Amino acid sequence: MIHPLPRKPSTTSYYKSTSALNPRLVEEDNFPVNGKTSEQLEFLLNYAVLNPSIHNTQPWVFKITDDAIELYANTRVLATADSNYRELIISCGIALFDLRIAIRYFGYRDIVEVFPEPYNPNLLARISFGSKRIVQLEEKFLFRAISKRSTERFYPANRNLPKSLISELESVTDSECTRLQILTSIVPDSSRREVIKLVDKGDRLQTKDPLFRQKLSQWINSNHEDIPIASSVATLMLIGSQNDNEYAWLATGEALGHLLLRARIDDVKVSCLNRPIQVPELRDSALWGFPPLKRLSRVRSRLQALFPDCGYPQILLHLCYQ
């Protein structure tokens, strides 16, 4: 069970909030090569907090010690649509992945302990430097993408993602212990349309957002030759995990962070369509057993039934070229 964070730092370490950092002003040449480990880690935090969170609440707090960074869930910014902390932890996983890439870029191995203290479940991860290493070319590209990446609400899709890129996106999520289902070309149009209907239903039940529904309707019904965009060039991706607990949510966040960076390298815009997975009003009668004990939403269960090979649905994404 996740609990509220302590409000006072310990005497041997200090907390670093996002507001105390200046990530948009950071320059890599200013990395304190000869500084203390704690100074180097604090510098690298600027890259971790550049990432987007699912509810745009930046639900993390970093605690810097002499030789490590501790990543905590900041439950004080909890969104009402995320009462079981699932998306909060996923968002923290994105920040964790960016921090790991920054550590590698500056020439160190990253050592990560997830949930290192069972009695302190708010502590999601402890990150420290390993031995010196040579940065890999792919890591350089991913690092450069951190400062450029952004998620968008909707962009009109004008061409298909190449199969080679789709394969790469599959591989990056697999490397973070999740499984990804691509809802384009390999899935019948009937299933794709059903997923879009679930997004619309989730929105209507959750927020009653007319602008979102209008954009969604335009996406489903293209005026060009009467071809539904959802069954032509729009690319939907469903990230799922083999388990449905805090460990799986953190791994999902790291996979999503990797995917967002890789997509950004090719100028692919990413939107989160997670409403059918969020809806609290549509709780299934079947309970799933990891505290806090919650019920899997019926809409989420329908996604799981549509794509059983994807495990537990965690994040539904729309990817396209602008």
Predicted regions, residues:
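Acidic, surface-exposed loops and disordered segments
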Residues: 1-322
